[in-house]
Curated annotation (Swiss-Prot):
Gene3D superfamilies, per database record: 3.30.160.810, Translation factors (2.40.30.10)
Gene, per the UniProt record: rplC
PROSITE patterns the UniProt entry points to: RIBOSOMAL_L3 (PS00474)
GO BP term, pick one: translation
Record's protein name: Large ribosomal subunit protein uL3
Subunit annotation: Part of the 50S ribosomal subunit. Forms a cluster with proteins L14 and L19.
Annotated organism of origin: Pseudomonas syringae pv. syringae (strain B728a)
Family that this chain belongs to: Belongs to the universal ribosomal protein uL3 family.
SUPFAM superfamilies per UniProt: Translation proteins
Amino acid sequence: MTIGVVGRKCGMTRIFTEEGVSIPVTVIEIEPNRVTQFKTEETDGYRAVQVTVGERRASRVTAAQAGHFAKANVAAGRTVMEFRLEEGDYQAGDQINAEIFAAGQLVDVTGQSKGKGFQGTIKRWNFRGQDNTHGNSVSHRVPGSIGQCQTPGRVFKGKKMSGHMGAERVTVQSLEVVRVDAERNLLLVKGAVPGATGGNLVVRPAAKARG
């Protein structure tokens, strides 16, 4: 796993190329990622860098978290993330920002999808509806059979049924970085990314190379 950064989704807009082509982009604010801990194979069994972003009131931080942040001499953040490292060294207090990316680079963006609440199978799993007429009574949006009879006598795990939709960890792969604004700590990524405006996003170099 290659090092990435934690950002905040600002929303979507579009930019134009010199030829006048409109490109839809998502604006991601890459707040300074403050290093809270650098893990090594000698001390932790693997190499990784732990970062925090944003701010959090002291009353909302547990004693253990407060001690961890104080040991690193960094302000308490709203979240803590960890990135595996193959090479490179960091120290507690270092900052990582949008400058680790370049225009044209492919990235993977991870976030929490928008919650949709309890939904039926048509909206949740794209099931087709049943007949509107021809003897159908109050079964227009029901899923139908969910299994067999005495054998196996149960509903298999993973059966697509009604339930809570959204609010899941989602990763969109191989999105192109259109522009990097280092002065304003902004990253413009082509296309849409998961989650609502203001949500946390994790941006990493793409795991799968095209071509």
